[in-house]
Amino acid sequence: MIKKKSHSGLKKRIKISKNKKILRGHAYKNHLAASKTTKQNRQLRGLTMVHKSDVKRIKIMLNNL
């Protein structure tokens, strides 16, 4: 039987919290920040929880974690 592998790209993009919640970073913050408002840049900081409709798919992709 083939050994199952975790999705390498996804492992780099998410973090699993102490309470087993899946966290992700916000989009639209890598560059061109000067054209965005200060409020917009501030709200893009930090991590947010993955939507509950995506959790099942992510857990399948991360079967080894």
From Swiss-Prot:
Any idea which UniProt keywords this protein has? Answer: Ribonucleoprotein, Ribosomal protein
Record Gene3D superfamilies: 4.10.410.60
Which domain of life does this protein belong to? Bacteria
Q: Does the keyword Membrane apply?
A: no
Family membership:
Belongs to the bacterial ribosomal protein bL35 family.
Known NCBIfam families for this protein? rpmI_bact
> What are the GO BP annotations of this UniProt entry?
translation
Matches recorded under InterPro entries:
Ribosomal_bL35, Ribosomal_bL35-like, Ribosomal_bL35_CS, Ribosomal_bL35_sf
Instruction: From the Swiss-Prot or TrEMBL record, give the protein name.
Output: Large ribosomal subunit protein bL35
Question: What taxonomic ancestry is recorded?
Answer: Bacteria, Bacillati, Mycoplasmatota, Mollicutes, Acholeplasmatales
Q: Which GO terms describe its molecular function?
A: structural constituent of ribosome
> Which is a Gene Ontology cellular component entry for this protein?
cytosolic large ribosomal subunit
| Disulfide cross-links | none
Q: Where is the signal peptide?
A: none
